[in-house]
Amino acid sequence: MTMESREMDCYLRRLKQELMSMKEVGDGLQDQMNCMMGALQELKLLQVQTALEQLEISGGGPVPGSPEGPRTQCEHPCWEGGRGPARPTVCSPSSQPSLGSSTKFPSHRSVCGRDLAPLPRTQPHQSCAQQGPERVEPDDWTSTLMSRGRNRQPLVLGDNVFADLVGNWLDLPELEKGGEKGETGGAREPKGEKGQPQELGRRFALTANIFKKFLRSVRPDRDRLLKEKPGWVTPMVPESRTGRSQKVKKRSLSKGSGHFPFPGTGEHRRGENPPTSCPKALEHSPSGFDINTAVWV
């Protein structure tokens, strides 16, 4: 009994030590989680502040008589939530919370949750302002391919549709003048209205121009090839077909002479078959189907 009691005491001590170590680890994790939550809430506040600054810049700047106009409009929903007028000052860029103040985290979270709600209401104005010049002058190369073709001719696609599309796209005229006009028009507007969609469209147009120049350098020159090798564009399909029909006709004649060794039957075949077989071969060759080719090839 004494040995068992000693073993039980040892096990209990080990359990107590493990519980103490787990408690210490849990306290450390709790502190780390608190620090991470504080950092996330500060990031949210910074996001709200940058969004407000972008809205102020995109709005063309406040009226000289009221410098705090756009900011007060964004702060009205905070007052409607039942909080005092001193709470919305957290949204201003001048006030920055510290990392050590862990007691203010719930208030920051509530302020962030209420400040993020009115932002989508005011952002459509910015998106509409950004979509305005894009609707007037689209940068999509497919629309230019369909509408701004060479000599305003309809788009004709052959067997290899992708190759025809790329060829027609390479034949399109350059749109550098339109881009310069867009840049001069955008210079009059404030800098804040140049959003991410316009920047992405500009970068895509730049990469498309580089790709187009590369393909034009790789593509063979048709005029030079026509001078060196005239007639390389149009393959001689009818001549090959007629040559094939003549070869098959010779084969059939030689085969016929082998099957009919008697002179009477040979003369009978020579007298009757040539006027009938030659017109048939000449008639069926342009259609692309020949009986002789179906038999022997």
From Swiss-Prot:
One of its GO terms (molecular function) is protein serine/threonine kinase inhibitor activity. Residues 137-180 are annotated as: Inka box. Residues 244-253 have a biased composition (Basic residues). The keyword Ubl conjugation does not apply. Pfam families: FAM212. One of its GO terms (cellular component) is nucleolus. Residues 92-102 have a biased composition (Low complexity). It is found in: Nucleus. Disulfide bonds: none annotated. Residues 82-109, 175-200, 234-285 are annotated as: Disordered. It comes from the Eukaryota. Interacts with PAK4. Inhibitor of the serine/threonine-protein kinase PAK4. Acts by binding PAK4 in a substrate-like manner, inhibiting the protein kinase activity. Belongs to the INKA family. The Inka box (also named iBox or inca box) binds and inhibits PAK4 by binding a substrate-like manner. This is PAK4-inhibitor INKA2. It comes from Homo sapiens.
